[in-house]
Amino acid sequence: MKNKWLSVLFKRIAAFFISIWVLSAIVFFLSRITPIDPLQSYYGERVEKMSEEQKDSARERLGLNDPIPVQYVRWLKLALSGDFGISYKYKQDVTIVIKERIQNTLILGVLSYVILFIGALLLGLLCAWNENKFADRLIVRLGTITSCIPEFWMALILIFVFSVLLGWLPASGAYSIGGGSLLDRLRHLVLPLIASVAGHLWYFAYMVRNILCEETRSEYIVLARAKGTKDSTILFRHCLKNVLPAYISLMAVSVAHILGGTYLVEAVFGYPGIGMLTYESAKTSDYNMLMVLCLLTGVVMIAANTIAELVNARLNPYMAQEEK
């Protein structure tokens, strides 16, 4: 069994690196066929005053006149050595700009994921504990409504209510000008966190509820009830233990979906993270920055799916047996 699981591990790791290479090639070629002139991103308004000779010289210096396959091979060699180039817009090393932004995305993303993981589990337990009762029906209806609201609409509603009408919370940014205290950063995190979590919370809670309700109808649960075992003991000691592996696998597979929602929330709230930086790079055709951001996002998504498959193979031996 151990050898079979190691075989699954080896195959998944090999598939991971192949997927990253294919992703880098696709993103590179797509970024090079956009209609936006990268010189506009690099020189700004000054490009309009440049002559054609100056533009050709600038393109030659940036390596934009070479065939796209040649550009890709050159970029790949530099990337493997840790050199991802200079950002056209920020005139800094790409990795330096990303390091300044990635901590904000990590804070927002990790907090959203933890709150979602715990909140959905507790909400699903509450619904299963009160199956078909008032609390269960109320949560189901409220959850159905919130899950139908797109994240950008949820973000706009939150901004309008809590920032425009009530003035309780800031509408954008990661901290106030001249601020930066822990309390100030937390106030700026509240609305993006709610927008990130609200759209996903009920989906996962509903999955937990349904799995738990189905589990409570199993034969061993019926037998336990016949022996006089308390419902709380059945739910928390027996049912939850059997549901957790499936729930962990579901949350691992959903990292990509949650990450995409976090990027969208960053763009709406003007939160200075990787999502906002990706939007700005795409808008200005900042090739080097866009390449690294898309590759970084792809690595996270592919890694999350790979880890989820490995977790499934570890928790479910039958899956490992099917891998040949």
Explain the meaning of each model-derived region.
Residues R59-P67, G85-Y88, V94, S176-L189, ...:
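Membrane-interfacial helix-loop-helix junctions in multi-pass membrane proteins
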